[in-house]
């Protein structure tokens, strides 16, 4: 699994999307009501690094 560190440009919220690839990531974001044009992908991390940061995960 990949952990995409994302930022919502409207709220400034940082969060992870845990998924297998970019297509699945976008599907998860849309299913959770996010506008893809308002989301920046900051980094892609492994599970261990993502757990250390502790942001919410979708």
Pin down the residues of each PLM region:
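Short amphipathic alpha-helices within nucleic acid-binding modules
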Residues: 25
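A short, exposed loop/beta-hairpin motif centered on an aromatic-Gly-Thr core
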Residues: 12-20
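Short, mixed-charge low-complexity intrinsically disordered segments
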Residues: 30-58
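A generic structural signal for ordered secondary structure
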Residues: 3, 16, 41-44
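Short aromatic-glycine-(Arg/Gly/Cys) micro-motifs in beta-strand/loop hairpins
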Residues: 1-13
